[in-house]
Every structure is written in structure tokens, then in C-alpha cells.
Amino acid sequence: DQASMQRASRLLHQCDLRPRDCARRSSERGQGERWRQQLRACDEDSEPRQQCCQNLQRISSQDRCRA
């Protein structure tokens, strides 16, 4: 939904990632679902912020979508 997308993109900025590039590339490479699950975990604060960023960056670097 809209609100969680906004939270997600704020989170990604804090992690130095560009949400759109990431989402697009990761879905092209079949990683989209993993990426979304990770974002959701971050959004629900089930993981510490730092851990979140690292996980997202790991997925991102595999998809080469670093900001």
C-alpha cells in the first residue's frame, strides 16, 4: 500500500539505495520477491535498522543497484 511504500523508500534512502533502480533490476533478475520480503521485514521493524540496510545492500549489490 501507499504508506508502506513511502516508509520503504525513506528506509532505502537511509540505506543509500535507490528504490526504483533496485526494485526494477531485482525483479528483472527474479529477485523481486526476496527484495520485497526484505523490505517488509525492515518496515515491520522485525530487524534492527542496521541489519536491514546490510541485507538490502547485499541483495542490491547482487543486482548492482547501488545508489
Curated annotation (Swiss-Prot):
Main location: other
GO cellular component: aleurone grain; vacuole
Signal peptide: none
Biological role: This is a 2S seed storage protein.
UniProt similarity note: Belongs to the 2S seed storage albumins family.
Subunit description: Heterodimer of a small and a large chain linked by disulfide bonds.
Name of the protein: 2S seed storage albumin protein
Organism for this UniProt entry: Matteuccia struthiopteris
